[in-house]
């Protein structure tokens, strides 16, 4: 598969450059070409370059290439256009190519980018050795999407097309499954972990659209094939030495291999039409989907010297574990939109969905220390899941009041989930703790109501206000469950979850004059969480947040354009009712931004921007757990100049500076970065 991926990747990048060749060779009035290049950019990094790359998606050292290449060719019988980008060294490639000849058309799209990750774990400032541990490897994931579509216009309103898509992910990323780190008698989950990923997706799609007796008819048939190979690495760390089992367990290594693969087949049919002199729009759609997935998993445990071991009480040596799941869904959607008067718009939508899922798995385990590759016990599981989902929505818009627009929306969803689980334990040493049967009926509902409006009582004043209420309830009802034969007999013990939220936002904009236009915005959210588990009292938790934003546009002279903003984000989280001590958490971030554009003359332009963010949220909860809260200072500065000696040619040197300084009691990874680069653009035709 990697050979196929490399071939498609080569074809995609080659198409970007080859498609540009005709535009460079053709020289007549029908051709328009422009190019913006980055001959060179160099990032000088002092400090944690991995965190810098993860924050800004900019690779250290040198990158360069084509930032944007546009080409267009038109004549009565044939037209083509392209838009491409290729930054070497940063894994950033993009190309869009469109060609039409008569009723035939072809679209080609290629996009690839690289996402960077920091390999640093968490921080516990009371540790002297293993706080903020960093992996000894760089983590980056290349993500790409290739699509080609070709088709033909059937008539003025209809067309048929076939497309092929390929997506892949290749590389490694950090994971938040942080490992246990032990110093003395204290253990905290702050050790870094990472995962290798090799994923391929192929999608084949056939689409047809036409108009039949006033109805627009759309049909689509697709087949998606996917396969992923991943390997997760987790290493526990400890300052305690020795060969005692408990001490060796503190330095264990776990490696997990997972290979899920499957296919998704779906069919969709949609009908819609306008009627009653375009005052009523109605639509009906149906979708059928079938998902079939298989997975192979191996989980192995080692000591710190990578010798195979079975160290933990519930050994994590699982060999050749397999699962097979399939799911069927039927979805119906109906919508109706009416315009009874010019100032009124009423819409409604209804959705019904039936879903059935069946699955089974085997989980073999080797509990001998060291492992002897003989399966001691196998857990066999099966699941049967039936879900019915209904959804309704109503919208109302009114513009009958001068300088005013009012709207309201209401959404409701009901879900009925019937889940049957069955697990048995077989083998040389079966475990009664792993045997259980349960049937659960889980009804849930969700409601969202929104009301708001836009008001302009005077030309210089514009106001927008919105209020929203949310409610969600999930009642877990175990209709039948085997009696507990041990601590692990039940896979879940939740009884109920209830979430209620209120939101409001307001924005006021002033336009007293053209050269100065300020605006103020306030966003408020109050959310309550009510949870209840078996044999325990209800826990109530709440989060209250405020976001204040001030924006400004200033044009003191025709050749100077200034924008600025200030944002203050505050949140407060506390458990008002709980069975144990849960500390209150307060957080806040202040951000300032300023940008300036100065046009000296038609040939010389200067631009600059400054961003400063400050977070002071360190909450020292080390006595009962990990410290919480982001605590940092961040500065981003950009400065550039654009010189246009000729109408179709320009040069632009640029400079950027990035600073990140964290409170080392909460986070590690400071950096200072200086970036210098040169941009050039050329247009002809």
Give residue ranges: language-model regions.
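Sec/Tat signal peptide C-region and signal peptidase I cleavage site
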Residues: 23-27
């Amino acid at each position: 598969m990697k050979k196929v991926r490399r071939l498609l990747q080569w074809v995609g990048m080659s198409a970007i450059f080859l498609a540009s060749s005709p535009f460079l060779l053709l020289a007549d009035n029908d051709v328009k070409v422009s190019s913006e290049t980055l001959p060179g950019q160099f990032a000088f990094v002092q400090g944690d370059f991995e965190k810098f790359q993860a924050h800004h998606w900019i690779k250290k050292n040198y990158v360069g290439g084509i930032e944007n290449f546009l080409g267009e060719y038109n004549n009565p019988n044939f037209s083509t256009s392209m838009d491409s980008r290729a930054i070497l060294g940063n894994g950033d490639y993009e190309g869009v190519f469109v060609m039409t000849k008569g009723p035939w058309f072809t679209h080609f799209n290629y996009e690839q980018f690289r996402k960077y990750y920091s390999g640093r774990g968490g921080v516990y400032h009371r540790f002297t050795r293993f706080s903020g541990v960093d992996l000894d490897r760089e983590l980056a994931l290349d993500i790409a999407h290739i699509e080609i579509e070709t088709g033909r216009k059937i008539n003025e309103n209809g067309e048929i097309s076939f497309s092929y898509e390929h997506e892949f992910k290749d590389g490694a990323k950090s994971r938040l499954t942080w490992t246990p780190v032990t110093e003395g008698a204290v253990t905290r989950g702050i050790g870094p972990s990472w995962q290798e990923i090799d994923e391929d997706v192929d999608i084949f799609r056939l689409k047809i659209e036409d108009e039949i007796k006033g109805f627009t008819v759309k049909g689509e048939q697709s087949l998606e094939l996917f396969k992923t190979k991943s390997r997760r690495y987790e290493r526990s760390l400890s300052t305690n030495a020795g060969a005692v089992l408990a001490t060796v367990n503190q330095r264990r290594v776990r490696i997990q291999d997972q290979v899920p693969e499957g296919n998704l087949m779906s069919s969709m049919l949609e009908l819609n039409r306008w009627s009653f002199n375009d005052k009523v729009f109605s639509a009906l759609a149906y979708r059928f989907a079938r998902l079939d997935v298989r997975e192979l998993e191996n989980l192995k445990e080692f000591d710190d010297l990578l010798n195979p071991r079975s160290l933990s009480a519930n050994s994590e040596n699982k060999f050749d574990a397999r699962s097979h799941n399939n799911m069927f869904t039927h979805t119906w959607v109906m919508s109706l939109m009416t315009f009874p008067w010019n100032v009124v718009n009423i819409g409604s939508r209804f959705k019904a969905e039936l879903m059935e899922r069946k699955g089974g798995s085997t989980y073999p385990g080797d509990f001998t220390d060291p492992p002897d590759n003989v399966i001691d016990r196998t857990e066999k599981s099966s699941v049967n899941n039936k879900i019915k989902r209904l959804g309704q929505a109503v919208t109302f818009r009114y513009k009958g009041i001068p300088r005013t627009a009012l709207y309201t929306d209401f959404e409701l969803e009901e879900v009925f989930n019937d889940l049957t689980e069955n697990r048995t334990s077989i083998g040389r040493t079966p475990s009664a703790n792993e045997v259980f049967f349960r049937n659960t009926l889980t009804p849930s509902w969700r409601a969202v109501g929104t009301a708001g409006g836009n008001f302009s009582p005077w030309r210089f004043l514009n106001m927008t206000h919105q209020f929203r209420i949310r409610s969600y309830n999930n009642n877990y009802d175990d209709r039948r469950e085997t009696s507990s034969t041990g601590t692990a007999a039940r896979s879940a013990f939740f009884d109920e979850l209830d979430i209620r939220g209120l939101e409001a936002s307001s924005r006021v904009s002033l336009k007293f004059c053209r050269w100065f236009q300020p605006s103020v915005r306030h966003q408020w959210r109050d959310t309550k969480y009510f949870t209840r588990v078996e044999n325990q009292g209800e826990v109530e938790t709440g989060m209250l947040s405020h976001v204040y934003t001030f924006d400004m546009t200033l044009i003191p002279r025709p050749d100077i354009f200034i924008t600025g903003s200030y944002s203050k984000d505050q949140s407060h989280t506390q458990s008002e009712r709980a069975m144990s001590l849960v500390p209150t958490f307060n957080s806040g971030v202040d951000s300032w931004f300023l940008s300036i554009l100065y046009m000296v003359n038609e040939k010389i332009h200067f631009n600059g921007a400054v961003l400063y963010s400050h977070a002071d949220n360190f909450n020292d909860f080390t006595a009962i757990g990990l410290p919480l809260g982001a605590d940092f200072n961040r500065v981003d500065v950009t400065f550039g100049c654009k010189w246009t000696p000729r109408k179709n040619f320009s040069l632009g040197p640029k400079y950027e500076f990035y600073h990140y300084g964290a409170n080392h009691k909460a986070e590690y990874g400071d950096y200072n970065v200086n970036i210098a680069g040169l941009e050039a653009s050329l247009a002809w035709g």
